C-alpha cells in the first residue's frame, strides 16, 4: 500500500538519502529520469502526472510555480539533488550559459567546483 504523506515537501524529503552534513546534497533515491533528474508520480486534480523532484522542491521553497522560461539550476552540479539551497531558479538561457562556461573551464583543465 502506498504511503500517505502530509505534504509534498514531506514526500520529497522522505525520498532522499540522509545528507552527510548541513551543506550536503539531498540526493533523490526514487525513480530517475534518463538524464539523472529525480522523478515522482502524483495525482493532481484527479489526473496522473510525472514531475521532476527538483522543480517541485524549488516551487515549494519559492511558494509559487516556476515561470515557463524558468528552471532550477543545480549549483552543486548533482542532477539528483533536491536540496533547496543548491537550486537557483534562473532562465533557460542563464542555465545554458553557466553550463557552457563550466564545460569551457573543464576543457582548459580547470576543476569545476560547484558555485
Regions found by a protein language model. Name each.
Residues 1-72, 77-115:
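Conserved recognition-core residues within compact binding domains
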